[in-house]
Structure formats: C-alpha cells, structure tokens
C-alpha cells in the first residue's frame, strides 16, 4: 500500500441547535444534522468533509448518508487519494440521488490529498483574495419581535446585505420585505437585499413581486431560484422578462446542468455550493459560468465550518464570485476562528499567511 493510499474512512454525526428557526418555502428546522467524514491515509494524513441534510434533498437524510458511505467504503480503501476527482465522478454516477454525500466524501479525500502533498487550501484555489464579506439570511416569519432582534443583531455585526426568504404568499412576502426594509432604513446605514424563493413561485407571481419591490424602491440585487428546479419553460420566460437577475440554485448541481441553462437561456447566474457539487465540479461550474459571463454566487447549506470552510476558501482563493452567501455559521453558536479563517461578523479573513 502506497503512502497516499486510503487506509480508513470514518464518520460521526453532528447535531446542533440553531440560534434561530431556519424557515424557507420548503420547510423549517430548529437544529442542524450533518455527517462528518474523516479520511485517513497510510502515512497518517487526514482530511475532513461534511454531508449536511437539507430540505432540498429530503431523501438524503442521515441514515441514507451513512448507508452510502458504508457501501462505498470497500471500493475506496486502498486507492491512491490523488484520484479523488475520479472517485467523486464514480460516486455521482452510482448514487445520482445523493449529491451532497458524494460532495462530502470528495472534500474529505481532497483535503487528505492536500495534507499529504503539503498544499494549502487557499493557495490551491488561487490565493487571489484574503477576505470576503457574506450576506445573512432572513428566514420566513411573522414574528415581529424576532425580526427586530435578528436585524438588530445583524446590523451590530456589520452585515450590509440581507437575503430574505420568500414563499409566494403575496401578503406575507410584502410584509416581511417591508418590515426588514423599515428596520434597516431606521439605522441610516446603506444596505442591499436579495430574495430567495426556494422554488415556490410561478412566473407571474415572481414578476409581481419584482414589480412590487421596484415600485417601493427597495434595493434588491437579485431573485434566487423562484421557480421549480425543472421548470425550464418557466425559467426561460422569466429570464427574458424579469427586471431582476435570476440566480439559479437547485436547478444547477453540475456543469451538465449549467450547459442546459446556458444553451436554453434559463437564468442570469448560478449559486455554486461545495456541499451540493463538490470541489472539482464546483470549479468546473465556475469556469463555465465565467466564460459565459454569468453572475456567480458562493452559497452553502446549513453546515458547520467543517464544510463551510471549503466554500469560504474557494470564494477567497478564486476571487471569482459576485455575491457571497456563506452565512450558515451565523445560525450556530460558533468561535471567532476556524483554522486559518477568522470570523468577524459579516467578514471572513485569512488570519495565518505563513503557509
């Protein structure tokens, strides 16, 4: 067995309460549940990856994640970790309904390979920038006290961009957006908004909300995934008529999906998440999107810094993203640093530049 051969793969569950109920059009949760993967090589080098659970992939639950890892382990043990990209392709082909698990495994393999090779994650991504600033998500709610507290906390932490979850209920969406705007305007500080429909809208209801926010003069930058992920006809129509850029999330998990989007004219940009696409495929999507002058957003699931850090370092290292949506750690109790990443409110900074 070569020194870079995979010796062992272990998993553990992480279940943590959220500091606020995370509610979208797809559901709500008060705690997060991820499976953490540890890959150990013959020479002792290790890498960690995270497989989160999400409303987006309800069948990819903790039990299913563990089952896939257990079934995949025999085919991975003994192989050279430098083949991580090929192994990820194999896993995605064999388990097409388990993209986040394949991504978590790939991230752990990739990190073990980096450790074995003496490479730094940030530098491997390009080392282009050492700081990024994220937005923060405002969940669907009618709780006046919560909204006031959540926005007040975010303002004190230095957030300037707010991604509001909406669900196609006209009255509720108007109230929530209006309340957030009123609270932010009261601070006297500049701010911007993003809307995230999580597949809850029709073409007409989306255009109606776009018209409303424009009429009210709200500073909205974009509308993320308003329609069903596979509503290609609707996305094409919406892309043509929407006054706001349409950013696709659930519609794009792979470069093949993005090729369809580009060829059919289905959106103005894409939300790239390491948690859903992994390392190799995420970078391929970045490259393809840039070549076609699409807007790029760096996003995440509800995940710990084990998984989120890969997205942060990708965004920093490539400096390729127009929008940063890497805020999941702010739904958890957390420290002010993780490895070489410092966490200062809305800002992530690389704090160790010796490597």
Segments predicted by a language model, with ranges:
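C-terminal alpha-helical cap/extension of soluble enzyme domains
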Residues: 302-355
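Structured loop/turn residues at beta-strand edges in well-structured enzyme cores
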Residues: 4, 157, 218, 265, ...
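Short glycine/serine/threonine/alanine-rich loop segments
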Residues: 78, 119, 244, 294, ...
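Short glycine/serine- and small hydrophobic-enriched flexible loop segments
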Residues: 111-115, 287-290, 312-316
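Structural signal for conserved beta-strand scaffold positions within catalytic alpha/beta enzyme cores
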Residues: 136, 271, 325-326
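Catalytic core of soluble alpha/beta enzymes
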Residues: 164, 170-301, 305-309, 332-343
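N-terminal capping/lid subdomain adjacent to the active-site entrance of alpha/beta enzymes
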Residues: 2-193, 198-207, 211-214, 241, ...
